């Protein structure tokens, strides 16, 4: 079953085999946080299907194939509905831009598309408020495709009457991730494959066929090289690169506590905690226990419909849902608290990105200010400022 077939199902029987983590009210000192929507970026005829923060810019991908760059400085102005007159817009492929990632130096943007392709873009700094974006490559590249056509056994059966080389995705590319050293790009697809690309020349190094039994919806990478993939088959699989062969990954674990398809993943910075969002509205919390293996320690419940996206900033977890809300969670020891429910979208929240607000005067050793960007099927992007005491 593809994500679109089950994404918005509402089931209150959420991952019933996993106990709920503490749902008690937050400690008194955490009750003094506040949040507000500081801007709404009005959409036109397409919804935002993906977004990523890249330095001083918010990069968004839409359901009508557009990639748009907007200066974060323009969003900090006192304007609840900022103009998009100065946005940089490019269009590529057919259908939605399913996922976006940026390099650590913010010079590369990589986009995943519904037309089965991956595209690489170069960002050049023009001024404080403007960037120039250039299309560098479409994956698989022409040279890679030509070489594979000449190689024996490079063509595989993808449908009853269709063959193609193993470097091609044959369905929507649903998620992307860069390795810590940014030498490898990982892509997953509704075609159930996990592919690995070398970023120096964007050659496809490896393709794991049938990595799952259904569409793969999300991917997350830890600093130690573990690769987590999540699927509509209800499973999360863990892959590790073999030390003897940097090109080859092997399955090292399968996490099977979800009762419904898994749509989203997020890892804490130290890689010790993994969050997974299910179509039943539950968020499972996985923690590395003795022996170095992930174990489910509980579930966060509160959303009434599918979890569609997750993000982590410091100790905070942000979750976007088909119930049109974003929730903010914080873990304290082994307990978790829902600190806020952000309401205002008129459609499912499809994608989110959060970041520490370095420019806020409210940041102290006892408080944290974050900016959260949420994209919805209502075609709007909302910008939220969140102040939370520690």
What residue spans do the PLM features occupy?
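Intrinsically disordered, low-complexity acidic/Ser/Thr/Pro-rich linker and tail segments
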Residues: 1-57, 68, 76-77, 126-166, ...
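Loop/turn segments within WD40 beta-propeller blades
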Residues: 51-56, 101-106, 177-183, 219-225, ...
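Blade-level signature of beta-propeller repeat domains, shared across WD40, Kelch, NHL, RCC1
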Residues: 350-355, 360-390
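Conserved strand-to-loop turn within each blade of WD40 beta-propeller repeats
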Residues: 61-64, 112-115, 188-191, 229-235, ...
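Short loop/turn segments immediately following beta-strands, especially the blade-tip
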Residues: 73-78, 122-131, 240-246, 287-292, ...
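A structural motif specific to WD40 beta-propellers
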Residues: 36-39, 78, 85-88, 134-137, ...
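WD40/WD-repeat beta-propeller blade N-cap
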Residues: 34, 41-48, 90-97, 141-147, ...
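WD40-repeat beta-propellers
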Residues: 67-71, 118-122, 188, 194-198, ...
């Amino acid at each position: 079953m593809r994500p679109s077939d089950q994404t918005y199902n509402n089931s209150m029987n959420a991952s019933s085999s996993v106990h709920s983590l503490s749902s008690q009210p937050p400690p008194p000192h955490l009750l003094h946080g506040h949040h507000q929507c500081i801007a709404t970026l009005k959409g036109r005829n397409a919804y935002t299907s993906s977004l990523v923060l890249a330095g001083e810019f918010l990069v968004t991908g839409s359901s009508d194939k557009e990639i748009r760059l907007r200066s974060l400085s323009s969003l900090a102005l006192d304007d609840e509905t900022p103009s998009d007159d100065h946005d940089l817009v490019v269009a590529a492929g057919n259908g939605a831009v399913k996922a976006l990632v940026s390099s650590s130096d913010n010079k590369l943007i990589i986009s995943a598309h519904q037309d089965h392709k991956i595209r690489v873009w170069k960002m050049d700094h023009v001024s404080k408020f403007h960037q120039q974006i250039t299309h560098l490559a479409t994956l698989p590249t022409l040279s890679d495709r030509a070489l594979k056509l000449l190689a024996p056994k490079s063509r595989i059966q993808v449908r009853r009457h269709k063959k193609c080389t193993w470097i091609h995705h044959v369905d929507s590319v649903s998620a992307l991730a860069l390795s810590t050293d940014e030498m490898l790009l990982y892509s997953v697809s509704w075609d159930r494959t996990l592919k690995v690309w070398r970023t120096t020349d964007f050659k496809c190094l490896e393709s794991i066929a049938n990595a799952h039994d259904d569409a793969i919806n999300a991917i997350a990478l830890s600093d130690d090289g573990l690769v987590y993939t999540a699927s509509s088959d209800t499973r999360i699989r863990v892959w590790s690169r073999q030390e003897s062969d940097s090109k080859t990954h092997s399955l090292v674990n399968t996490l099977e506590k979800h009762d419904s398809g898994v749509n989203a993943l997020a890892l804490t910075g130290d890689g010790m905690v993994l969050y997974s969002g299910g179509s039943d509205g539950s968020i499972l919390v996985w923690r590395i226990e003795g022996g170095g293996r992930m174990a489910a320690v509980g579930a966060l419940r509160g959303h009434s419909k599918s979890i569609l996206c997750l993000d982590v900033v410091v100790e905070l977890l942000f979750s976007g849902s088909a119930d049109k809300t974003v929730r903010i969670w914080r873990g304290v020891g082994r307990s978790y608290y829902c600190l806020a429910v952000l309401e205002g979208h008129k459609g499912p929240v499809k994608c989110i990105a959060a970041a520490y607000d370095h420019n806020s005067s409210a940041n102290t050793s006892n408080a944290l200010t974050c900016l959260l960007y949420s994209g919805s099927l209502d075609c709007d992007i909302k910008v939220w400022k969140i102040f939370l005491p520690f």
